[in-house]
Amino acid sequence: MTPQAFYLALEQAGFALTNHQKEQFDTYFKLLIDWNRKINLTAITEENEVYLKHFYDSVAPLLQGYIPNEPLRLLDIGAGAGFPSIPMKIMFPKLDVTIIDSLNKRIQFLQLLAKELGLEGVHFYHGRAEDFGQDKQFRGQFDLVTARAVARMQILSELTIPFLKIKGKLIALKAQAADQELEEAKKALQLLFAKVLDHQPYQLPNGDARYITLVEKKKETPNKYPRKAGIPNKKPL
């Protein structure tokens, strides 16, 4: 997917980018490739592949109407090189984006990226989701949480749901069918007072299968969740 094909696909979906936004995506690509030589940010480095499998894939929830262009607080867990939240922020500048990542070098890249792109309303924190999820500054403070290929839903729900306001939504992006995952996560979602609202397959323009799962927080998360760092992975709910 060339940059031009990416812009056209967005335009056909009703989202025509400004020249400034196009320049932001171009700068993002160049910085990603430059920094990838120093630290491992992505295995995908060819321009057309980055635009398809990182940029387009990241903004798919916007194209499908899951996120409005409003000043909502969005938290991205384990964003790595900024996916999906930074492409979302470029497209929808009103979003207030927070990223938590466990590798400090990635946070340094994101800080530089935000500066070079001229992004405002972006915040980066180094650490584990389990620790931040018990911090009053973060717990129950977000309208949306995004996670792209982070963990199975059984684990992911414990890492993300505590951050949401009541009626806030988790948007999980996956490359494999999550039907089995959702079945395994039933108990976890019940314990966390969350409910699956939607689970939709879609295709990237090249035909690759992807899945979006939308989960809503119904009540306050019990205080014991999330458990200490590492436990959700070792002993899923």
Swiss-Prot record:
GO cellular component: cytosol
Source organism (scientific name): Streptococcus equi subsp. zooepidemicus (strain H70)
Membership in a protein family: Belongs to the methyltransferase superfamily. RNA methyltransferase RsmG family.
Function: Specifically methylates the N7 position of a guanine in 16S rRNA.
The name this protein goes by in its record: Ribosomal RNA small subunit methyltransferase G
Enzyme Commission number: 2.1.1.-
Signal sequence bounds: none
Principal subcellular localisation of the protein: cytoplasm
Keywords from the named record: Cytoplasm, Methyltransferase, rRNA processing, S-adenosyl-L-methionine, Transferase
